[in-house]
Swiss-Prot record:
Chief localization: cytoplasm
Taxonomy of the source species: Eukaryota, Metazoa, Chordata, Craniata, Vertebrata
Start-end of Polar residues biased regions: 1-30
Compartments, as annotated in UniProt: Cytoplasm, Cytosol
Bias-annotated ranges (Basic and acidic residues): 32-41
Stated name of the protein: Molybdopterin synthase catalytic subunit
Modified residues (Phosphoserine): S20
EC number(s) given by UniProt: 2.8.1.12
Top-level EC class as recorded in UniProt: transferase
Length: 189
């Protein structure tokens, strides 16, 4: 059984230090000179939607564990072009309660398929400029195969099942809402 932390805000300056992330750290026991076999740590699923810039390093640190030898990441960023048009930013919208619920289901699926320890899924909302991260998924596991496969499954499932919409904003002052061809509700269009 895993604990779940869901937040609609990102790291504020007050929460940047590890000691101030109590809600996350309270779920894990810190090793204090004990034998590695004595370390007790509850698995965590951390889901967050935010309008703030994502820190890949901070998200990856949330899943680090003394019980794990691997942390695998997926980082989705805004690229500067689409079909010959210059993209200046993306704008994301989501139905957050449903999106959180769908991501929770994805985390549960991952735990049924792979022996992973912690899962973090962070997604930006609002404007995301070129080269900035819109999605960060981090998974820790004892060995790399499980976390690598879980991260791949997580992003594929997120794109297929989670109600998040993306608008591309182009340099020539036009924009276009993009249909996600992978999502189940758009199939057959």
């Amino acid at each position: 059984m895993s604990s779940l932390e869901i937040s609609n805000s990102c790291f504020s300056p007050e929460t940047r230090s590890p000691s101030s992330r109590q809600s996350v750290e309270d779920n894990a026991s810190e090793p204090s000179g004990k034998d590695v076999d004595d370390v007790q740590e509850k698995p965590k699923d951390i889901i967050q939607f935010t309008a703030e810039k994502l820190s890949v390093g901070e998200v990856s640190q949330l899943v680090v564990s003394p019980l794990c030898g691997a942390v695998s990441l997926f980082v989705g960023t805004t690229r500067n072009n689409f079909e010959g048009k210059k993209v200046i930013s993306l704008e994301y919208e989501a139905y957050v309660p449903m999106a959180e619920n769908e991501i929770r289901k994805i985390c549960n699926d991952i735990r049924q398929k792979w022996p992973v320890r912690h899962i973090a899924v962070f997604h930006r909302l609002g404007l995301v400029p070129v080269s900035e991260a819109s999605t960060v998924i981090a998974v820790s596991s004892a060995h790399r195969a499980a976390s690598l496969e879980a991260v791949s499954y997580a992003i594929d499932s997120l794109k297929a099942k989670v109600p998040i919409w993306k608008k591309e904003i182009y340099e020539e002052s036009t924009s276009s809402w993009k249909r996600n061809k992978e999502c189940f509700w758009a199939a057959g269009d």
